[in-house]
Amino acid sequence: MGKKYVYLFTEGNGTMRELLGGKGANLAEMTNLGLPVPQGFTISTEACTQYYEDGKVINPEIQAEIMEYIAKMENITGKKFGDLENPLLVSVRSGARASMPGMMDTILNLGLNEQVVDVIAKKSNNPRWAWDCYRRFIQMYSDVVMEVGKKYFEELIDKMKAAKGVTLDVELGADDLKELAHQFKAEYKAKIGADFPDDPKEQLMGAIKAVFRSWDNPRANVYRRDNDIPYSWGTAVNVQSMAFGNMGDDCGTGVAFTRDPATGNKGLFGEFLTNAQGEDVVAGVRTPMHISEMEQKFPEAYKKFVEVCDILEKHYRDMQDMEFTVEHGKLFMLQTRNGKRTAQAALKIACDLVDEGMRTEQEAVLMIDPRNLDTLLHPQFDAKAIKAATPIGKGLGASPGAACGKIVFTAEDAEAWKARGEKVILVRLETSPEDITGMKASQGILTVRGGMTSHAAVVARGMGTCCVSGCSAITMDEANKKFSLGGKEFHEGD
């Protein structure tokens, strides 16, 4: 037996970040703490390095080991890959040693094909859910593995919504989603020149390769340069059995922090969407509800979640940023990591952890990054001016501070205008990881959709850039570079 490249969650622990990546090590640690984690395995960072050494292929030895671990997963879950009785569906997610929000790619619902969708539709008596999973999988796989842009699929969804006279994805029925899945496959064939893969093993290897490949994508390289992350580290891949937040109204998904990442105040801070999958919250596609509302909707899962938060914060002795899913009222933990926070919050959290007896004063001092102290001197609005002014719109204060600049609508324009010495505010429907360089060039960021845990919010807080998200009163006209708000029109350069 050669080198070991694959580890079950039960075989790892939180100290193995270099080998299992941050997400893999924390999934293993949560498993060891007895928390409800959907089981799976992690392919190590060494397999990523090997992939690049072998000329960007996964060698037969590593492929065989991965399939051996799929068999172990089948035994644990009692489900089988590509089976028509009880199919195993998995998520494939990246996990580098250092947290890189939005940089690396995720694929959910892997293992589906037309036959399997029919089976799970009948078995669950929930065809809407089955086809929703499939269309999401085709969309993610096409985007992440085959690099067919998201926008083609978004356009098809928007067309379908317009045809049905609805505004939200959730309002589309089973037949609409089935039709979308077929349109997506046709789009895939038109762009790639081959049929969408039906074989789960082929899908799995394609997805794993895509994660390894994304370690080298332009976004990831920009983020690494800014945050001093060595290229040689590589990324791990987590393959995990799916927990479904999109099976109906007794399901949902959310992202939460054990303390407020903007102020540092103690208490659950986060967001939740019913009948949704994880990507929906983070991608900021629908604007979610506050975590406190979860208590009314899912009292059992909420109670369990509060317990889990307490266990994790005491265990890691730091504020945690967690992703979770509720499937038919039952809680599943998908991720935990030390949460990104503003400099103000970092100061308050460090002091509070000392008061709560979790950290010594020496440890608390080391928790503050000296480079962040300057953001405590962030521009703030003049208190008198604020009282005198009439606000034209309201959104969520996702990242603190005050900013003023000229309006731009794309990341490219933000960079170009900054290069000319202009100060700009980037206005977007929602930001995506591709916008990171434009976000860096901006004084502030304003988005129409998305919440406090959306991509824009998390990245802006990390950069110390002022950000207002989810300002839904804005009517956007991206094509003509203008938007209206409070009865006025605003154009590029205003």
Predicted regions and their residues:
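Nucleotide/phosphate-binding sheet-loop regions of phosphoryl- and nucleotidyl-transfer enzymes
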Residues: 1-389, 422-425, 432-437, 443, ...
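Conserved structured catalytic cores and adjacent interaction surfaces
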Residues: 394, 398-493
